[in-house]
Amino acid sequence: MNILPKKSWHVRNKDNVARVRRDEAQAREEEKERERRVLLAQQEARTEFLRKKARHQNSLPELEAAEAGAPGSGPVDLFRELLEEGKGVIRGNKEYKEEKRQEKERQEKALGILTYLGQSAAEAQTQPPWYQLPPGRGGPPPGPAPDEKIKSRLDPLREMQKHLGKKRQHGGDEGSRSRKEKEGSEKQRPKEPPSLDQLRAERLRREAAERSRAEALLARVQGRALQEGQPEEDETDDRRRRYNSQFNPQLARRPRQQDPHLTH
């Protein structure tokens, strides 16, 4: 730590401190010079503006007199004389515009959109409505046809068919209801409880079936089927004992017996 102040790059070194102070003083001088130039430029610009303003005020009466004698300034219009005389003006086709107006008026009258003051909608239409037409002789009266619903409602044959359909539906519902009631009564009829002898026989049958299934499973695990009434004999010879297969007992096999004559 004592060597650190003697390094040339140390911030507290005398040379470095003097260099920093010299740079700061130079920066301050440059900033002052820049501000002086800005103020000088602003002063010159203001002086020039005031000079131009004074010249403009002195020459204003002369300009007003010159403008009074000269024509008005503006864009040059080469066709002003033609427009004043009415030449070169594009005019539309009056006949075509009149035909379009009449066609539009006819369509609006047919639709009932265009009506004049004091005119009804019926008068505005090109054809009077059907209720204002006189009835023709020997033909059907104008207007909509008689209501078909009223005729069908007053038809006696249709009424008879409707009553017959309701009767058949009612009879079918009664037949299905009677069958359902009969089946429900049979299902709800309580059954006779079994006797004790029947329950005991079923229990013994279940126990015998479970016992035989357990014996068959053990025999399959050990790799051989037990004969009924024959007790299982344990193999004492390790070389003849079956291979142990904990997870796949059906794949366990007995080792192959070797011929004693071939071994010697």
Swiss-Prot record:
Any one cellular-component term (Gene Ontology): nucleoplasm
InterPro entries documented for this protein: CIR_N_dom, LENG1-like
Pfam families in alphabetical order: Cir_N
Keywords: Coiled coil, Phosphoprotein
Residue(s) carrying Phosphoserine: 59, 245
Coiled coil stretches, renumbered: 16-46, 89-115, 196-222
UniProt-annotated stretches for the region Disordered: 1-37, 49-76, 118-264
Low complexity biased stretches: 59-75
Compositionally biased tracts (Basic and acidic residues): 12-37, 146-162, 170-214
Other notes: Belongs to the leukocyte receptor cluster (LRC) present on 19q13.4.
Identification of the protein by name: Leukocyte receptor cluster member 1
